[in-house]
Amino acid sequence: MSDISLSQLLEAGVHFGHKAYRWNPKMFPYIYSEVNNIHILDLVQSATLLKEANLYLESAARENKTFLFVGTKRQASTLIAQEAKRCDSYYVNHRWLGGMLTNWSTLKERIAHLKDLEQQEANNTFDLLTKKEGALRRKELKKLRRHLDGIKDMKNLPDIAIVIDQKRETTAIRECRKLGIPVVSILDTNCDPDLVDIPIPGNDDAVRSIKLILKSLTDSILIGKS
């Protein structure tokens, strides 16, 4: 299991929440104090729940479970793709398309179309088309890659979802809940802990905070797989 110390959490700014007026009262148990109208999260609880999440993911990886990383905000997008690839998992790091999980059969058709276009590109088929048609297909390929590249090799629904920014990814979380897919999520002070299975109280806006927690979760998956 990947262990993170309190000093590491503190240094990464994991404890900084949102302005007090933006809080969700359900996050009260995880809040340590309020300083200059900013809520400060209890890092002891953050460390404890991160450890719990790490143990859960390590155990799941040992059982060959599959993982879907979700984070479409600017601060998380690159990290989501990077960490998902590092542990050979799937990811959505741009816009979540409604029905990505709940309408999986239709989405698989879009993925098949993406792979067909990629094959056409590899075979230089685009160059044989009219300039306009070739440009249209390249544009479509670029758009499909942006949205589906991280899940194009996903054969079935994932076993577990790892989410950054619960408030932003409400559609993804709603689909996971509907399908019974457990959700591990970083929860800032404006989030609702009732909507996830394993909450990790933490700053979901700062890159250093997201990076530290995501890396720890990914390390645990890799330990389980090994």
Curated annotation (Swiss-Prot):
Chloroplast among keywords: yes
Localization annotation: Plastid, Chloroplast
Primary localization: plastid
Keywords: Chloroplast, Plastid, Ribonucleoprotein, Ribosomal protein
GO molecular function: structural constituent of ribosome
Keyword Plastid: yes
InterPro entries documented for this protein: Ribosomal_uS2, Ribosomal_uS2_bac/mit/plastid, Ribosomal_uS2_CS, Ribosomal_uS2_flav_dom_sf
Gene Ontology cellular component terms for the protein in this record: chloroplast; mitochondrial small ribosomal subunit
GO biological process per UniProt: translation
Cross-referenced SUPFAM superfamilies: Ribosomal protein S2 (SSF52313)
PANTHER family reported in the protein's UniProt record: 30S RIBOSOMAL PROTEIN S2 PROKARYOTIC AND ORGANELLAR, SMALL RIBOSOMAL SUBUNIT PROTEIN US2M
Cited HAMAP family: Ribosomal_uS2_B (MF_00291_B)
Family statement: Belongs to the universal ribosomal protein uS2 family.
Protein name: Small ribosomal subunit protein uS2c
Gene of this entry: rps2
